């Protein structure tokens, strides 16, 4: 006799980590910058193995010092400095954070090397901060030169905060540059804003499980009375895909086939772009009578 398994309902979009945990991925040849409070813990996971990590720390006094982690340096931080001198995205974020806090990359002169080229996959090193500090975890390595040695690989950093986030408190990703404007769009509402050529627009689902509609119009033509927005047919035809995505096929076009927007990053990956807006009938048929919907909004 086959005994059926007890199944649990699956609720997509719920946070996988607790209110005191944060998960970061350190790209090969990249870094991640952490702001730590007293009592915060973090661990570095060597995902594929054979990957060295370098740990740099700034104390609350602004000095490059590993004492907040109760560690003594065994290296001079050159590997991390070389990474931060590049135009790699995580390096720009680190430089932005350090600049706002008044720290200089040139002041990095102490670090500790974690793991080695012989470290096994999923090896873990754990640390705890006893003071306010800024820590940089980097995954140094050469480019993929297969005839010399293994290429650099990713590291995972999991932070356990001493203070849990309160209900309604959210954690935002680090901005690349100083934000020009931040808009909090409340539920059931919409917001309009004007951007210049070259500006970046970042839409963040703060709490998860929230759909959003995005529309764009050419401001100059709109002032002339021409309402030219994102065109479904031209965007799909010129990009050769159901919806644009980062990479070669990344642009949205208007009715005259002029490029309007380019997708730079997409952590969702699946969208109902150019789909029909939801209506009250859609929810009525499902039994949710009077549910707010895009068409009524």
What kind of region is each of these model predictions?
Residues 1-297:
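Intrinsically disordered, low-complexity segments enriched in small/polar residues
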């Amino acid at each position: 006799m086959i005994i059926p398994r007890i199944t649990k309902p699956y609720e997509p979009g719920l946070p996988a980590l607790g209110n005191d945990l944060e998960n970061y991925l350190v790209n090969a040849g990249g870094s991640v910058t952490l702001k730590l409070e007293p009592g915060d813990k973090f661990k570095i996971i060597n995902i594929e193995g054979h990957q060295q990590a370098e740990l740099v720390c700034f104390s609350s006094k602004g000095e490059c010092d590993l004492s907040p982690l109760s560690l003594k340096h065994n290296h001079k931080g050159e590997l991390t400095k070389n990474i931060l001198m590049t135009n790699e995205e995580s390096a720009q974020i680190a430089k932005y954070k350090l600049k706002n806090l008044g720290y200089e990359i040139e002041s990095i002169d102490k670090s500790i090397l974690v793991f080695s080229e012989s470290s096994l996959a999923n090896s873990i090193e754990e640390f705890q901060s006893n003071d306010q500090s800024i820590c940089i975890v980097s995954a140094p390595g050469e480019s993929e030169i297969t005839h010399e040695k293994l290429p650099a690989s990713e590291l995972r950093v999991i932070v356990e905060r001493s203070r849990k986030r309160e209900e309604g408190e959210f954690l935002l990703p680090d901005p690349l540059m100083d934000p020009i404007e931040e808009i909090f769009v409340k539920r059931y509402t919409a917001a309009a804003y004007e951007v210049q050529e070259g500006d970046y627009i970042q839409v963040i689902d703060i709490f998860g499980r929230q759909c959003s509609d995005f529309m764009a119009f050419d401001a100059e033509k709109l002032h002339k009375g021409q309402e030219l927005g994102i065109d479904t047919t031209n965007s799909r035809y010129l990009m050769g895909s159901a919806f644009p995505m980062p990479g070669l096929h990344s642009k949205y076009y208007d009715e005259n086939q002029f490029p309007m927007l380019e997708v730079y990053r997409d952590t969702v990956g699946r969208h109902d772009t150019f789909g029909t807006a939801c209506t009250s009938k859609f929810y009525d048929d499902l039994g949710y009578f009077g549910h707010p919907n895009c068409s009524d909004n």
